[in-house]
A protein has these predicted regions:
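C-terminal accessory module of base-excision DNA glycosylases/AP lyases that mediates lesion recognition
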Residues: 1-32, 132, 146-215
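Short secondary-structure junction/hinge motifs that connect adjacent elements
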Residues: 24-42, 79-80
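Alpha-helical ds-nucleic-acid-binding substructure associated with the helix-hairpin-helix region
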Residues: 25, 53-54, 58-140, 197
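Structural motif
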Residues: 34-42, 100-104, 193-200
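N-terminal alpha-helical segment
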Residues: 41-45, 88-92, 130-134, 170, ...
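Short, aromatic/basic-rich helix-turn unit that serves as a nucleic-acid recognition element
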Residues: 44-48, 52
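Generic alpha-helical structural context detector
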Residues: 46, 63-67, 110-114, 154, ...
């Protein structure tokens, strides 16, 4: 799955027409460059590892985890995917902690792997479900909440109309762009974003990128 050139073109045209403030952001940021990641299991593992820590710390831990996986699979073909559920389950909780994961994140990562191995979460067919059904399927796994599921929908399945109303970055961007005194609540976010539909994912990406314009 990926964002098609036609979808991106239609989204940018729609968003520029429906929202003058967003149109200015689109002009300042430039082309939409997000790419959907094909490694679905790996995307979810990376999301769990990255929760509530800095970008730099998350990248360091992910690098160590991927190196440990490669070391454990030297005799196996990599096929471009460092993550697979069976390999994650071969590590003990203590081994994952030694790599840098907290006990909680190590448990969450193995829980995800077990759900995939058992077939409770079928990542090979999950794209056939609608957005809300995918969210419900994923949040049954400890460590995966609605936000993580929404990030998966956008950045792995390239779903076009996802609005992460609880994302701090988007809320901060909306406050800045629309001149609000405080961070918007869920109702305010949905009201502001209503014109963005059916391209809320594209608009959300531009909101995230708008934060870089102020740096």
């Amino acid at each position: 799955m990926s964002f098609s050139a036609q979808h991106i073109k239609s989204a940018r045209l729609h968003l520029r027409k429906c929202d003058p403030k967003l149109a200015a952001i689109i002009k300042a940021v430039g082309p939409f460059t997000a790419k959907a990641k094909r490694d679905r299991f790996g995307t979810l593992v990376r999301s769990i590892v990255s929760q509530q820590i800095s970008t730099k710390a998350a990248a360091s831990i992910r690098g160590r985890l991927e190196e440990a996986i490669r070391e454990s699979r030297k005799t196996e073909p990599q096929r471009g995917k460092p993550y697979c559920p069976e390999t994650i389950l071969n590590f003990s909780i203590d081994e994952l902690r030694a790599i840098g994961l907290s006990r909680q994140k190590a448990t969450y990562t193995q829980s995800l792997a077990q759900h995939v191995v058992d077939g409770d979460v079928d990542l090979s067919k999950i794209n056939k479900l609608d957005d809300e059904a995918i969210i419900e399927s994923l949040i049954q796994v400890k460590g995966i909440g609605r936000w993580t599921a929404q990030m998966f929908l956008i950045f792995s399945l390239a779903r076009l109309d996802i609005l992460p109303v609880d994302d701090l970055g988007i809320k901060t961007a909306v406050r800045n762009v629309y001149g609000l005194d405080e961070l918007p609540d869920k109702t305010e976010m949905e009201e502001i974003a209503e014109p963005w539909r059916p391209y809320a994912s594209i608009a959300s990406w531009y909101m995230w990128r708008s934060l870089e314009l102020d740096q």
